[in-house]
């Protein structure tokens, strides 16, 4: 199988299938797909600049709450997933709804999902 054929196969996967692929690759090859984290060099000097504000957020569905069907519909509408994939994502909570979202997008997703009863965390 050529690299182009592999890429074509990956393009056809759903978000949940891609997540499963990443998890299996991590297990098989003993690696992590997590972004590298910078290690702090120590405490900032007195009078130093304020810590830089975080610019990317992961929107995590912690719980669907009482109105699970409304949350599934909202996840489906907000992510573009099919009904089956949206239901699977909600059933697997806590689970990332969106990774690497801007602050505005993350806050908007959080507000819309909390409006239908979901418990959301921003990381």
Curated annotation (Swiss-Prot):
SUPFAM superfamilies named in the record: ClpS-like, Ribosomal protein L7/12, oligomerisation (N-terminal) domain
GO biological process: translation
Quaternary structure, from the entry: Homodimer. Part of the ribosomal stalk of the 50S ribosomal subunit. Forms a multimeric L10(L12)X complex, where L10 forms an elongated spine to which 2 to 4 L12 dimers bind in a sequential fashion. Binds GTP-bound translation factors.
Pfam family, one: Ribosomal_L12_N
Entry keyword Ribosomal protein: yes
Bilayer-crossing regions: none
This protein's UniProt keywords: Ribonucleoprotein, Ribosomal protein
GO MF term set: mRNA binding; structural constituent of ribosome
Statement: the UniProt record of this protein carries the keyword Ribosomal protein: yes
The protein, known as: Large ribosomal subunit protein bL12
UniProt similarity note: Belongs to the bacterial ribosomal protein bL12 family.
């Amino acid at each position: 199988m050529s690299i182009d054929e592999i890429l074509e196969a990956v393009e056809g996967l759903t978000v949940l299938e891609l997540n499963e692929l990443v998890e299996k690759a991590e297990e098989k090859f003993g690696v992590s797909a997590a972004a590298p984290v910078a290690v702090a060099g120590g405490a900032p000097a007195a009078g130093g600049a304020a810590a830089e504000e975080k610019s990317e957020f992961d929107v995590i569905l912690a719980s669907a709450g009482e109105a699970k069907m409304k949350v599934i519909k909202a996840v489906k509408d907000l992510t573009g997933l099919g009904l089956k994939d949206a239901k699977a994502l909600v059933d697997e909570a806590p689970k990332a709804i969106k990774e690497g979202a801007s602050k505005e997008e993350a806050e908007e997703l959080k507000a819309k999902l909390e409006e239908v009863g979901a418990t959301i965390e921003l990381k």
